Regions:
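Ubiquitin-like/PB1-type beta-grasp interaction modules and other compact soluble beta-rich domains
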Residues: 1-80
Length: 81
């Protein structure tokens, strides 16, 4: 299946692009997508451990099964101070 991944500004800056297209197995989860991104984009590896994933505008768990054509948005938590 194909999904689109939208990166937050900080992730896009580290990766050099705002969107990634992924080809995943039919039963893939958010965690599977994150593993594939880490393989393809080494600059994001350390940041992927703390991202907050969203699908269809809703925060989701890493165990959420994805569907073909969905957009997975990845945001970094905001730092307080």
């Amino acid at each position: 299946m194909q999904i689109s991944v939208r990166l937050s500004a900080a992730l896009a800056q580290a990766n050099g692009q705002t969107r990634i297209s992924l080809s995943l197995p039919e039963e893939a989860t958010v965690d599977d997508a994150l593993s594939k991104i880490a393989e393809q984009s080494p600059a994001l590896r350390g940041k992927l451990q703390i991202v907050i994933p969203f699908v269809a505008g809703q925060q989701v768990n890493r165990t959420k099964q994805l569907q073909s054509g969905q957009e997975l948005a990845l945001l970094l938590p905001a730092a307080g101070g």
